[in-house]
Amino acid sequence: MTFASKSLLLAAVFTAVLSGGLWHRLDSTRHDNQTLRRELQTEQQARHTAEWLLHGQEQTMQVFSAIRAANRAARLADETEHHDAKEKITTAITGDNCSTRPVPAVAADRLRELEKRTRAIGGDPARN
């Protein structure tokens, strides 16, 4: 075997080893790339799910906030109406002799009965 053929054989072996190493490295990189893509897809799905859940929670909080505001406004309107009615009645009976007499027991019982039925039908706002 001559020096040229030995050099050529050595270059061929070196090229084969180098090509094999590069081929292995390329295959390993492809496998890692596929794994990273799957992990990225899983993380993106988890993020989308979390965003969807958070959006649902935000909408729920907005609904409850609107309900709370409506209840507060209704309570304030009821209080205002009650106060206005009380003032109108007080003004209307001022100076009338019926304002100094006690309410008959039968009338008071009837009013209590009406109040109980009204609260039972519409719910007791004092309990809310």
Curated annotation (Swiss-Prot):
GO terms of biological process kind: killing of cells of another organism
Record carries keyword Membrane: yes
Residues spanning the membrane: 7-23
Subcellular location: Host cell inner membrane
Domain of life: Viruses
Inducing factors: Expressed in the intermediate phase of the viral replicative cycle.
Keywords, sorted A to Z: Coiled coil, Cytolysis, Host cell inner membrane, Host cell lysis by virus, Host cell membrane, Host membrane, Membrane, Signal-anchor, Transmembrane, Transmembrane helix, Viral release from host cell
Membrane topology: Single-pass type II membrane protein
Coiled-coil spans in chain: 24-51
One cellular component (GO) term of this entry: membrane
Iron-sulfur as UniProt keyword: no
Quaternary assembly: Interacts with the spanin outer membrane subunit. Part of the spanin complex which spans the entire periplasmic space. The spanin complex is composed of spanin inner membrane subunit and spanin outer membrane subunit.
Biological role: Component of the spanin complex that disrupts the host outer membrane and causes cell lysis during virus exit. The spanin complex conducts the final step in host lysis by disrupting the outer membrane after endolysin action has degraded the host peptidoglycans. Host outer membrane disruption is possibly due to local fusion between the inner and outer membrane performed by the spanin complex.
Protein name, UniProt field: Spanin, inner membrane subunit
Organism lineage: Viruses, Duplodnaviria, Heunggongvirae, Uroviricota, Caudoviricetes
